[in-house]
Amino acid sequence: AFVGWLVHDATRPPRRPYLVTPEKFELLSHRGLRVTEETWTNRDGTPARGWLLRGDEGAPAVVILHRYGADRSWFLNFGVKLNEATNFTVLWPDLRGHGLQPPVEWSSFGSRETDDALSAVEYVRSLRTPAGRPLVADSLGLYGVELGAYAALTSAAREPRARSLVLDSVPASPDDQLLAVVRANTGLDNPLVSFLARAGTRVYFLGGYNNASACAAARALGERHVLLLAGADAPHLRDSTEALSRCFEPATNVEVQTGLALTGFTLGTAPGEQGELYDRRAIDFFDRTLRATH
């Protein structure tokens, strides 16, 4: 019974009201936003949803993937600023199990989220202008934090058009993500609980749990642009991100900044000035690297 509770609780992320919605954001900022609610289908047939802000025809797109326990609203402000600075198309999915009344009730700690990220990329690449032409350029960017960073990295290893990645506080594997959630939920950090959580999760997913390492995905990237971010607000993820930085092959252009006072892990609740500095760092990277490949 303990193992069943442990796994069930971990696979159901906490759900809270959105920090902000596009409608509230428009009222507060007096911007004429064109953010729309969109739906598509994941590769396993489950439904997916996200907010979409269309950019200029022929400009790149960026898909923004939040961390475990957060939701798309944490990065609405960041994505709007990215669109305003670059005219890129921006898509904010809710990862499975996240957001209000999620269409899929459970998270898989990155195992299924890799395919979900690929489905989001396929969706944004399917967008058309009113004249029927492709909306977005061939190259695109992926931004992710923690669980979202793992999904961004592992999906990019299978999607060569993902040319630019901003990866913040990256767990080493789905097991690493799972055990962090179990520690947070129970306050327990010992080998027995870790063993039970890992074994129970594999039984729960009936053989459909893939514990692929982030390092293996990094080695497979080839010629891409990657910005790795981490900081003191998530020290265990700073360690795994620094370890990840040593996995990339020489062909991958990697920039590493792991001494940040603020990361995307706490960005949704960060004070304004710190958040502005963080946003500018990521926006400038996407602007510089995606325009170079566009």
List where the protein language model places each region.
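Conserved alpha/beta-hydrolase
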Residues: 82-103
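Hydrolase active-site cap/lid region
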Residues: 154-207
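Alpha/beta-hydrolase active-site loop
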Residues: 107-134
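The serine-hydrolase catalytic nucleophile loop
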Residues: 68-82
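Alpha/beta-hydrolase fold nucleophile elbow
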Residues: 132-146
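Serine-hydrolase catalytic core
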Residues: 27, 40, 48-51, 199-293
